[in-house]
Amino acid sequence: HGIHCBTLL
């Protein structure tokens, strides 16, 4: 979670 993986996680 945080920058660009927020949508995957």
UniProtKB/Swiss-Prot annotation:
It catalyses: D-sedoheptulose 7-phosphate + D-glyceraldehyde 3-phosphate = D-erythrose 4-phosphate + beta-D-fructose 6-phosphate. Keywords: Pentose shunt, Schiff base, Transferase. Belongs to the transaldolase family. Type 1 subfamily. Transaldolase is important for the balance of metabolites in the pentose-phosphate pathway. The keyword Transferase applies. This is Transaldolase-1. Its EC number is 2.2.1.2. GO terms for molecular function: transaldolase activity. Pathway: Carbohydrate degradation; pentose phosphate pathway; D-glyceraldehyde 3-phosphate and beta-D-fructose 6-phosphate from D-ribose 5-phosphate and D-xylulose 5-phosphate (non-oxidative stage): step 2/3. Homodimer. GO terms for biological process: pentose-phosphate shunt. It is an enzyme of class 2 (transferase). The keyword Transcription does not apply.
